[in-house]
Amino acid sequence: MKRFRLVSLALAAAAVLAPGFAHADVVAPQLQAPCGADLADAMTLLSDERTYVTCQEGAAGYAWAAAPVPFEPNDTWLSYGPVITLHGQGMRNPNLTSGRWTATPRDSETVCRVQQETVVEAGVLSTPQLSEGEPGQPLEVAMAPKLFYVELAGNCLWERD
């Protein structure tokens, strides 16, 4: 019985400590939190799924600032782990425009992924189209015309070419 407890404690400790050794967790953007100069003018959707923010330079450096809604479609987006769902030109007030995009992973383990749904006809959406890169490698993707929903995932910087 004593051996069972020791093994159980060892396994529990390993489970708790293991994530710390794998790689650092991605820090989710927060309103007024610092962001790097490499993200200047990038937008993202906060985890509340309602607040859009843009990385802007201020007196104290770069920070995430609330974006006025509605806003013009942006050509640079940051996905930071959880899926962010945006709207394309198949909907009023699109968040991004169709065309060629490149997703660049922000670390060597990240896989950039995008799922798109387009408008087929009034009230009808296409089957979701999935594109996924390789770990640490850029993903080039064509955002479809009449794009309705687009889900961006991974710790990636998405830029319109």
Regions found by a protein language model. Give the residues of each.
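Primarily secretory-pathway and cell-envelope proteins
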Residues: 2-7, 23-76, 108-161
